[in-house]
């Protein structure tokens, strides 16, 4: 839902979206159109993200046509250059999505993003549907492309081991609310919110040794809150082993525990 709102597919219910210093609400239709050309999306479903009746060439050519690249030779050059950047050969251009593997489709989807030289790429669980053997390849490729094209990337993921590899800044969300935000290194060595600690413990490749850092915590048996009936207190209180009466009744405010590190927890710094 977050990415759907950011992409303008769904309307926001509150707050504001600012792009390049200007609120989206104050943009003209032309400014919104220009903004959309600078924002691209890598979807989780690789097969559903590509039109089954369009060849790979057509899928890569379409965004160029929509963004005003009228010369066919120029479009072909951009496509071939971009294919090379994602490690795909020209022979794939005349194939169709069902003729490619999941990893190959994901590379084509990334190429489709890059052909229009975006400023921001939203990546929604970009490797969760891939075989483990391919996940590292795609992550390394994203990191290389991010550096080469000077891209900003918003990565949505549940696997903190993956996030650790690629993210500079991490925001932990629970029931649509940011409960902790900090630079990546700070999250992994000094997490303050109980939910963040539970997530870290659940990632086998990074959980070893976390017990000594106070991360050896579990979820409390209980019901998950109903999003349609928001609780007056902390949304995590029904599952938190540290929750007290205040947590049940009073919603925690965002608190800065160190420079650039904020958390929404009444007991931050004490657990």
At which residue positions do the language-model features occur?
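Helix-to-loop junction immediately C-terminal to a conserved catalytic motif
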Residues: 7
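Conserved ABC ATPase "signature" region
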Residues: 23, 73-91, 200-201
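ABC ATPase NBD coupling module
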Residues: 24-40, 66, 186-191, 225-231
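A short, proline-enriched helix->beta-strand linker immediately N-terminal to the Walker B motif
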Residues: 115-119
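P-loop NTP-binding/switch modules centered on Walker-like glycine-rich loops
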Residues: 126, 130, 134-212
């Amino acid at each position: 839902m977050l990415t759907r709102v950011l992409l303008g597919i769904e309307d926001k219910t509150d707050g504001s979206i600012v792009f390049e210093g200007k609120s989206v609400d104050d943009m003209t239709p032309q400014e919104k159109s220009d903004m959309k050309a600078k924002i691209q999306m890598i979807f989780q479903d690789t097969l559903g993200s590509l039109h089954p009746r369009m060849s790979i060439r057509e899928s890569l050519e379409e965004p160029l046509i929509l963004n005003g690249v009228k010369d066919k030779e120029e479009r072909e050059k951009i496509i071939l250059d971009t294919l090379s950047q994602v490690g795909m050969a020209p022979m794939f251009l005349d194939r169709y999505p069902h003729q490619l593997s999941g990893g190959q489709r994901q590379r084509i989807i990334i190429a489709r993003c890059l052909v229009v030289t975006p400023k921001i790429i939203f990546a929604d669980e970009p490797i969760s549907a891939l075989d483990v053997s391919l996940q590292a390849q795609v992550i390394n490729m994203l990191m290389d492309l991010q550096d080469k094209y000077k891209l900003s990337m918003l990565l949505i993921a549940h696997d903190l081991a993956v996030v650790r590899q690629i993210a500079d800044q991490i925001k932990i969300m629970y029931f649509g609310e940011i409960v902790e935000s900090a630079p990546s290194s700070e999250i992994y060595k000094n997490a303050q919110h109980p939910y963040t600690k539970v997530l870290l413990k659940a990632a086998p490749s990074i959980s070893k040794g976390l017990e000594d850092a106070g991360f050896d915590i579990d979820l409390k048996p209980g019901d998950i809150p109903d999003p349609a009936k928001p609780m007056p207190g902390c949304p995590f209180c029904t599952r938190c082993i540290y929750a007290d009466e205040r947590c049940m009744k009073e919603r925690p405010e965002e608190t800065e525990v160190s420079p650039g590190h904020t958390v929404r927890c009444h007991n931050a710094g004490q657990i």
